[in-house]
Amino acid sequence: MAMSKIATLAGLLASAGLVAGHGYVTKMTIDGEEYGGWLADSYYYMDSPPDNYGWSTTVTDNGFVSPDAFGTDDITCHRGATPGALSAPVTAGSKIDITWNTWPESHKDNQGPIINYLAKCNGDCSSADKTSLEFVKIQAEAIVDASTNTWVTDELIENSFTTSVTIPASIAPGNYVLRHEIIALHSAGQQNGAQAYPQCLNLVVSGSGTDNPSGTPGTQLYSANDEGIVFDIYSNPTSYPMPGPELYSG
């Protein structure tokens, strides 16, 4: 094959890698009970998709939100998101396992932080207005072991595309949206290259906590130029500047 054709093919493959999507959340598991998420590549095409706990989206391509859309509602719960009809019960202090349909197993294509937020619905989450939700960062993980270049997303893959988040024991009871997100960094070394995959699920939190921390609107969580949004993952980093508001320490 002529060198010009090889170069053209390589360029096309690289471009495909930049736009290809990664995945979505299929379910959460709480105390052994499974609660279904929005199956984006099938429910979207149904006239009457089943009620579920995940917010519906118009994302049929395992797609992402790019940094140039971080100031829009797309970043809140993904593109075209509307509230799920159901809410899963969880006790503050408990762990939630979250399972994705897939995530790229090519080492660099999968790496990035996993960040979790809570936003109080101030009513039933099935009628929540995403523009009024204010998110509190409750868990954020990135590099697990710099010596082996292991990220939390590597562990996600090793654990059958499942990760976990613990609801803080100090959080007051109520109806909440859990915003669970992976930010893929394989193209983040260039402007507008990071890929955000926000997923929202409804919870009813019980317990004896009393904290009602103030949060941040989805459209103000990140900016396109933040450290951690523009980031060279190929430089063998030993640390990662977590984007977004400060972590809740309650």
UniProtKB/Swiss-Prot annotation:
Keywords noted in UniProt: Carbohydrate metabolism, Cellulose degradation, Copper, Disulfide bond, Glycosidase, Hydrolase, Metal-binding, Polysaccharide degradation, Secreted, Signal
Intracellular or extracellular location(s): Secreted
Chief location bin: secreted
Keyword Ribosomal protein: no
Residues reported in the UniProt entry to bind O2: 51, 186, 195
Practical application: Lignocellulose is the most abundant polymeric composite on Earth and is a recalcitrant but promising renewable substrate for industrial biotechnology applications. Together with cellobiose dehydrogenases (CDHs) an enzymatic system capable of oxidative cellulose cleavage is formed, which increases the efficiency of cellulases and put LPMOs at focus of biofuel research.
Enzyme Commission numbers on file: 3.2.1.4
Cofactor binding: number and manner: Binds 1 copper ion per subunit.
PANTHER family tied to this protein: ENDO-BETA-1,4-GLUCANASE D, PUTATIVE (AFU_ORTHOLOGUE AFUA_1G12560)-RELATED
Protein's name in the database: AA9 family lytic polysaccharide monooxygenase F
Organism per entry: Emericella nidulans (strain FGSC A4 / ATCC 38163 / CBS 112.46 / NRRL 194 / M139) (Aspergillus nidulans)
